[in-house]
Design a protein with these regions (language model features):
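Conserved lysine of the Walker
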Residues: 20
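Conserved beta-strand position immediately N-terminal to the Walker
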Residues: 10
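P-loop NTPase motor core
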Residues: 54-79
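The conserved Walker
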Residues: 16-17, 155
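Residues at the beta-strand->loop junction immediately N-terminal to the Walker
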Residues: 13
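P-loop NTPase motor-domain active sites and their immediate coupling elements
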Residues: 1-7, 23, 29-30, 37-44, ...
Length: 341
């Protein structure tokens, strides 16, 4: 048995029907069997819309299952923001990892582990924003382990344009199911062998720090068993709050996300235009607000087209002028600003 926290991320690849999705189901099931929703939350990205949507009903979910590649990019950006927030909390507490942090906390203030499951990486890597997706995944893979965020990526296209060198370098733990050729096998585990597997759960597991892959066979979990597990957990009636700071609804549009009646939003527009850049820390300093409030305002500024999308550690570029903001707010009434964080 391998511990995901020690991997600390996992890459799964293999041909269609070789057992990838069953492996993902078994992994999720083993975690929800052992851990309460207070201790672990899942962010599931499933562009195929079929394999993992069954888990939407369980309280372990940090948000509804993501099915749109564009929404997936936003959610990955939100997880990077959550990672940075957790690093600040750990630094303020004087600890180096989530285990030490949680030992000092009461039960209700402990940080849950977050497991990000992507069932088809190829759909994200083939999207128009693949470079940004790769950058976000790489950033999380490099830094997220210490704050309890772990990635599990699966793909049925083990090619170099999907499993890039940058991604592979940050995923030392990998599982190769049956593939069509030696080239695909080497792309996944840097060795031949996966092309000779039998399928139906037969796999080669390359663990962190292990020079050679180990041949093992995965557990089979039927759809009926998964449904029974989900139904049992759902019937407990436990209600959990969604993860704060993670985009929630599918199919959101700009009109519903940007509240022009929020006076603090207009102040934020003027601050970023005056400083010719936008960042969460800038809004915190200039508006005297907390991190969560500032992060939400930055998201609103992006949706309104005031600042550029998230691009790693760079400050966001301001792409409108004051005249544009004045026109956008013409006719809106002012109210007392809510500066709560």
């Amino acid at each position: 048995v391998a511990d995901l926290a020690k991997m600390p991320h996992l890459l799964i690849a293999g041909a269609t029907g070789s057992g990838k999705s069953v492996c993902m189901n078994a992994l999720i099931t083993s975690l929800i069997y052992k851990l309460h929703p207070l201790h672990i939350r899942f962010i599931v990205i499933d562009p195929k819309m079929l394999e993992l949507s069954v888990y939407s009903a369980i309280p372990h979910m940090g948000r509804p299952v993501v099915t749109s590649p564009k929404r997936a990019e936003q959610v990955l950006s939100d997880i990077v923001v959550e990672m940075e927030k957790r690093y600040r909390r750990l630094a303020e507490s004087g600890v180096r990892n989530i285990e030490d942090y949680n030992k000092r906390q009461q039960e209700e203030t402990k940080l849950p582990y977050i497991v990000v499951c992507v069932d088809e990486l190829a759909d994200l890597m083939m999207s128009a924003t693949s470079n940004k997706v790769e950058m976000l995944i790489t950033r999380l893979a490099q830094m997220a382990r210490a704050v309890g965020i772990h990635l599990v990526l699966a793909t049925q296209r083990p090619s170099v344009d999907v499993i890039t060198g940058l991604i592979k370098a940050n995923f030392p733990a990998r599982i190769a199911f049956q593939v069509a050729s030696k080239v695909d096998s080497r792309t996944i585990i840097d060795a031949n062998g996966a092309e000779k597997l039998l399928g139906a759960g037969d796999m080669l597991f390359l663990s962190t720090g292990q020079p050679e892959p180990t041949r093992i066979h995965g557990a089979f979990l039927s759809s009926e068993e998964t449904d029974r597990i989900v139904t049992f957990i759902r019937d407990q009636g436990l209600q959990m709050m969604a993860l704060e700071g993670i985009s929630q609804a599918e199919g959101e549009n700009t009109e519903t996300e940007v509240d022009l009646g929020d006076p603090l939003f207009r102040e934020a527009c003027e601050v970023v235009i005056r400083h010719k850049q936008g960042s969460v820390s800038l809004l915190q300093r200039r508006l005297g607000i907390g991190y969560q409030r500032a992060a939400r305002l930055i998201d609103k500024l992006e949706h309104a087209g005031v600042v550029s999308p998230f691009d790693g550690s760079k400050a966001r570029e301001v792409i409108v002028d004051q005249a544009h903001v004045d026109a956008m707010f013409s006719g809106s009434a002012g109210e007392p600003a809510d500066r709560s964080s």
